[in-house]
Amino acid sequence: MGFFVTSSIDIVKVRGDLVFWKYKRLWGKAQLKSCYDAVIIGGGLHGLATAYFLARDHGIKEVAVIEKHYIGFGGAGRNTAIVRANQRTKENLPLYDEGLKLWPKLADELDFNLMFFNCGNLNFAHSEAGLNALRLQVASAQFLGIKSELLDPKQCKELVPGLDISDRIRYPIFGAMYHPPGGTLRHDAVVWGLAKGATRLGVHIHQGTEVLGIGVEDQRVVSVETDKGKIYTPRVLNAAGGYSARISSEMMGIRLPIHVLPIQAMVTEPLKPFLNHVVSSGVYHVYANQSLKGEIVTGSHMDPWPSYTTQTTAHYIKHQAEALTELLPCLKGVKFMRAWAGLADMTPDMAPIIDGNDHIQGYYMDCGWGYFGFKSAPITGKYMAQFMATENCPEMLKPFTLRRYEEHRLMGETASPVNYGPEFGWVT
């Protein structure tokens, strides 16, 4: 079932002071066919973006996106919608940088307001060691031509006047990495925009449809079994987010080094604009930004145990309140309005697993993004579509192969604002 939003409303009739409106579906509802050129498991941003670029760039329009619930049900609709390219490794930075530049173009192309707000990101350091780590991070970004700089506490205060830079807080601010190209978007707008663009090009989106199995003959994908019937296809993309490792293990016999950890987020009541940048602290385990509606959107570190629960806990809400009011004392007394949780599919090196045709011909994987999935979705979808259409992995994606774990080529990506829980192992 499609969503209805104000950008697709027609005035039907005006009678006196009454205005009658007609709502149009952003995307249609298609019958499940018995044969598709490609099947994508997961109606999140990576799946929708790949479907869109398969149709747009490669003429592969017989594509089915299979979603067990509704599109955007998983991480696509539960994240805090922050985008940035301030990672540290040479493999990650070019991908995120190119992805950051794609967002404004995508909004024009889809003819859909994704509400991109280029507000910049501030990542705080609370010790000399933390400041040295940020110097390395800034140098890595600048080496690749990505705008980033190191700020002292007074410069941080100029950008965020409400920030407490005194030494009275538990962890005083020593400085910050400022990343001007970063910002925020509206995550549901991105989901709807990509769905609209994909279906306009002929892609079929099947919500409320569960994948039960993947058929393989002679080490080649031949079909997908769903609760609505069998689909014959030569290509399958596993883009199921938190459930991707389970699908890969149970349906394909390929175990992935992924832990699934709940990650929680909250929003406050609307406030007058005062926070013009995304702020984050790895020591306080908090990141926050102010939405266009005035709410403070904030997240924390992940739960310290593997789980598929999406329930929130009082402990994390209390932690967020304490951390936010230390960094931004003006938030004392502000109410949290709601909280939610999503699933982060974490790998040992905090980098994704992107692979295809290595184990089974026609089986592709785009998973293990943790809480970086939103930032990378459109650009990864573009390259993933190229991979599936040509059967040749683009250079940009080659470092993320599953074989890097067997070959001991872990990325070591540590440029994240939060810690990520327990020791990792080969789990499903």
Where are these regions (language model features)?
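Extreme N-terminal leader/targeting segments of oxidoreductases
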Residues: M1-A38, F53-K61, E423-T428
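Glycine-rich Rossmann-fold phosphate-binding loop(s) that bind the pyrophosphate
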Residues: G42-L48, K68
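Glycine-rich FAD pyrophosphate-binding loop
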Residues: A55-G77
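Dinucleotide-binding Rossmann-like beta1-alpha1 core, especially the glycine-rich loop
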Residues: T80-G162, H285, A323-L324
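Short beta-strand to alpha-helix junction loop
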Residues: P94-D97, F124-A133, M177-K196, H206, ...
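Helical element adjacent to the flavin cofactor pocket in flavoenzyme catalytic cores
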Residues: A176-R235, Y243
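C-terminal catalytic lobe of FAD-dependent flavoproteins
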Residues: T325-T428
